[in-house]
Amino acid sequence: MSVSASAENLTTDAQSCDGGSMCLELALEGERLCKAGDCRAGVAFFQAAMQAGTDDLRTLSAIYSQLGNAYFYLGDYAKAMQYHKLDLTLARTMNDKLGEAKASGNLGNTLKVMGKFNEAIQCCKSHLEISRALGDRLSEGRALYNLGNVYHAQGKQLGRVGQNDPGHFPQEVRDCLMQAVAYYEENLELMRSLGDRQATGRACGNLGNTCYLLGDFARAIRYHTERLRIAQEVGDRAAERRANSNLGNSHIFLGQFENAAEHYKRTLALAEELGDAAVEAQACYSLGNTYTLLREYRTAEEYHARHLSAARKLQDRVGEGRACWSLGNAHAALGNHEKALYYAREHYSISEQLGDVLGMATAQMNIGDLCKVLGLPVDATPALPHDSADAPRTPFNALRVRRQSMEQLSLIQITPDAKKKDGDVKQDREMVRAESEEGEHTTEMFMKMVERCQSSRMDEQRATLDKENRPRGKLQRSASSGNKHP
């Protein structure tokens, strides 16, 4: 049962609990604490309620349901599964069909996050069948939505093992994603008929994300546009921010970079309004990469510099390293080779501290090429900036890599290359992670794409700088070389 449904049951059954008033009072306090966000304390009260005991099976079922929900939110999925199974057993014992449907749905959601997709699908299908038999359209809508989520999650997990762009997954992954689309579409149609705008928006968001993974970017844009419109209509700023970000991602893959930039700018403004520093940094990173695709390297450099500053404030060393890598590339494209060399060395240092062998190799390659361009020995060290955020920072061992680093939230990874023709730019597009309406942050697939992009592009970076280093004689230092601040 949901928390609200459990509360109704607990209150209604108060008179039928002979000698069980203490159980009921403890359970209601546990529910209050869970609603207030203190699930750990709520669990303690629910456990005490069970110790107090009750002969009323509906009250006990409600306690099991809420314990399952509380453990789910605490991340203890094994215990959540245990209590949802107990709730399901009691519902069947009482021949409570609606309770059985809700317990099946809760169990399905728990099994989904545990990666037990086949079992989750069976539970969610039971939820759907019972809801339809009862004619409960709201419960049917939840079941359809949950089934879509299970197939979507299964497809994403299967897709992690490969290194494929959206639209180029193996057939088993596509099959899962297409099943997700089918259930989301049924849910969307039902929610529209019920006039539930919030649920309609969620369905559109998930349909947009799934179509994105299937490579149907035009369709993804249609759904995310509707998601954006509904979010604005109901005043859901967080959903509006997600929709803009997802629209930017989809426009990137269609080569519509100006449109992408506008959506990322809106994402940035909303992130600032919401006080979400990590997403604000993500948006700066996305804008830097988008302006690289537009070959507006000065603007790209400005956004990457903002990303670097944000990464340092967040103590996100992974994000800081990526920002240095991007800044080095942007400055190289602008011909600011000394600044590019400084950031390449910063990238190498951070990669070394993180144990990122691929990052070290990329940085070392760039350092070598830039030293050749500048006529410097490879082991020369450029002067460090002294008057900005590039000054000494907290030692690495005092920092923690954030669980949701900007790169794990990231959008695209591009190597600037001013020598390329416009027709080649689309080949630079890399994996863009579509944000889930559920708030999940699947990151491994994106990082693999970035690593593959970096590895395959090393030779291209070398070729560009080698061209600049051919028989024109030794390059002179720029007029700004006396200024040590990049």
Question: Where is each model-derived feature located?
Answer:
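Long, low-complexity intrinsically disordered regulatory regions
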Residues: 1-17, 167, 181, 378-443, ...
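Structural signature of alpha-solenoid helical repeat scaffolds
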Residues: 17-18, 55, 95, 135, ...
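Alpha-helical segment of the N-proximal tetratricopeptide repeat
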Residues: 22-54, 69-76, 156, 168-173
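Conserved alpha-helical positions within TPR/SEL1-like repeat arrays
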Residues: 24-35, 59-73, 84, 99-113, ...
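Eukaryotic all-alpha helical interaction scaffolds
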Residues: 51-53, 71, 91, 131, ...
